[in-house]
Amino acid sequence: MTDTAPQNDPTTSHVLPKGIRFAGVAAGIKASGKPDVSLIVTDRPSVMAGVYTTNQIVAAPVVLTRAKTPTSTGRVVLTNSGNANACTGDEGMQNAKTMCDLAAKLADCDSADVMVMSTGVIGKPLPMEKVRAGIEAAAGKLGDAESDFIASADAICTTDQFRKTVSETVTIRGQQFRIAAMCKGAGMIAPNMATMLGVVMTDAPIGPDAAQASLKQIAGRTFNRVSVDGHTSTNDTVMLVCTGMSVSEDAKEFNSDELKIWQEAATQVALKLAKMLVADGEGAARFFEVRVSGAADDGDAFVIAKTVAASPLVKTAITGGDPNWGRIVSAAGYAGPKIEPERTSLVIDGVTVFENGTPLSIDAAKLSESMKANSEVLADLTVGDGPGKASFWASDLTEAYVRFNSLYTT
């Protein structure tokens, strides 16, 4: 996807949390020769939390890392790209454990303090000699410069057309705390959790239970509200790393009010990344936002918005710049939650096309031209007079997506 607002700006500088070093190297796991081993290492034991795929087919690194979080002694987040290490049996689990052991030795910590993530093709054994060499090479390049952060972010990518990184600062207790994040993903994006890998990092003082609860809420408002193709991966993982190194080791953790301020800032960081996932959707031409209001509650609104955004007929209409409002309204009708047809209205890119259950006379050709001329389409759907509201973001569905994914493993 090109010329889309949510894309990353390569000229943007990043403010990085204190106490974290980064590296990314090419180990030959990918046939392309692009970077494929990423290391993130904290200078001291740190809080780490995670949210993971809801797929019942779960990759070995997810099984291993999920059992370790939340923790207050985390030191390493190790990622390989180019191979998912999923559906690889006992060998895959042993390989994931070996990766942790190798990183632990190089970081001088326990294997239990290493979190591992993998992404790529499913069902192929990891080339462990290459993985081993990559981990050793990455350990030798660890640094805290922005270039090191970028190298680490590049190494987690697979079919991504651009890296996805964001950073922000938030002032709490009269001092600045830093939040930096990276993620990857362009296909198999239908998270709940997400089809993607991501790491959110901060130097704020947050305990393990608070970190886990915060990350779950952050993901629920961001990564769980995007879709490219409706396919949930076996490897989805988002990690939260909290070093606490903006304050002294004996400083108190954030209280509930302070945590809310930090969480809102982190949510905005994650939302920017989530929108980048959609903007970089495989073969995508347009970024599509569905806003639902008037539902019985936010949960119902979310289900309706997600159903509309996931509909292949809606997606293809967006691709063609076709203001086919009937597809959107009918998708809302089969979503499940109760709607009020006589109070249902739809606005596409500022043009009301359906109001209180009745279609309006519009210049469809003009609206189509507007949709085709823009890379973003907004649908505002009212389904009643209830308090529930939600947004969901998706990409369209193009011939390029079909062509790319029909040849992915061959």
From Swiss-Prot:
Q: Which gene encodes it?
A: argJ
- The catalytic residues are T195
What pathway is this protein a component of?
Answer: Amino-acid biosynthesis; L-arginine biosynthesis; L-ornithine and N-acetyl-L-glutamate from L-glutamate and N(2)-acetyl-L-ornithine (cyclic): step 1/1; Amino-acid biosynthesis; L-arginine biosynthesis; N(2)-acetyl-L-ornithine from L-glutamate: step 1/4
Reactions catalysed:
N(2)-acetyl-L-ornithine + L-glutamate = N-acetyl-L-glutamate + L-ornithine; L-glutamate + acetyl-CoA = N-acetyl-L-glutamate + CoA + H(+)
Where, by residue number, does substrate bind? T158, K184, T195, E282, N405, T410
Q: Name one GO cellular component term.
A: cytoplasm
Instruction: Kindly give the PANTHER family that the UniProt entry links to this protein.
Output: ARGININE BIOSYNTHESIS BIFUNCTIONAL PROTEIN ARGJ, ARGININE BIOSYNTHESIS BIFUNCTIONAL PROTEIN ARGJ, MITOCHONDRIAL
Subunit field text: Heterotetramer of two alpha and two beta chains.
Per UniProt, which keywords does this protein have? Acyltransferase, Amino-acid biosynthesis, Arginine biosynthesis, Autocatalytic cleavage, Cytoplasm, Multifunctional enzyme, Transferase
Reply yes or no: does the keyword Transferase apply.
yes
Per UniProt, what is one GO molecular function of this protein? L-glutamate N-acetyltransferase activity
Note the Pfam families from the entry: ArgJ
The name on file for this protein is Arginine biosynthesis bifunctional protein ArgJ
Q: Does the keyword Transferase apply?
A: yes
